C-alpha cells in the first residue's frame, strides 16, 4: 500500500490510478524492489488499481473501509481477467503479492482457482 498520506485519512479512500506522484512512488518502491525479482524469468504484469488508503485497515468507519477495499479488489479482478484474455495465452501463472495486494491475491486465488479441478 503506497497510498499513505496522513492528510488524506478518511477523506480519500481509494487512489486515483492517474496520480503520477503516487504511481512513481509505487514504481520506485514496490515494483522496483519486489516485482523486479521476476524480470529474468517471467513476464511481469503489474497493473495499476485504485488501492485503498492505508487508513482502510484501521478506520472505525468499517463500511467505508470495506467499500474502499472492495473497489480495489474489483480493479484487481478486472485486470486479472483482462490479463487472462489478452496476455496469458494459457501459460503458467505466478501470482506474487505484497501488502494490500496480498489480500486481493488471496481472494483472487480462491475465486478463480479453488475447487476448479
Functional labels for PLM-detected ranges:
Residues 92-94, 110:
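Structured, solvent-exposed acidic/aromatic patches
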Residues 97-101, 105:
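Gly/Ala-rich beta-loop-alpha elbow adjacent to hydrolase catalytic centers
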Amino acid at each position: 500500500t503506497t497510498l499513505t498520506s496522513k492528510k488524506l485519512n478518511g477523506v480519500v479512500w481509494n487512489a486515483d490510478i492517474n496520480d503520477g506522484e503516487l504511481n512513481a512512488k509505487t514504481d520506485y518502491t514496490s515494483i522496483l524492489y519486489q516485482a523486479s525479482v521476476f524480470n529474468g524469468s517471467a513476464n511481469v504484469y503489474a497493473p495499476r488499481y485504485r488501492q485503498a488508503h492505508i487508513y482502510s485497515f484501521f478506520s472505525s468507519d468499517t463500511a467505508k473501509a470495506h467499500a474502499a477495499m472492495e473497489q480495489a479488489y474489483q480493479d484487481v479482478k478486472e485486470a486479472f481477467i483482462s490479463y487472462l484474455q489478452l496476455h496469458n495465452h494459457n501459460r503458467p501463472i505466478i501470482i506474487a503479492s505484497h501488502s494490500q495486494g496480498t489480500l486481493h491475491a488471496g481472494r483472487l486465488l480462491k475465486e478463480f482457482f479453488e475447487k476448479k479441478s
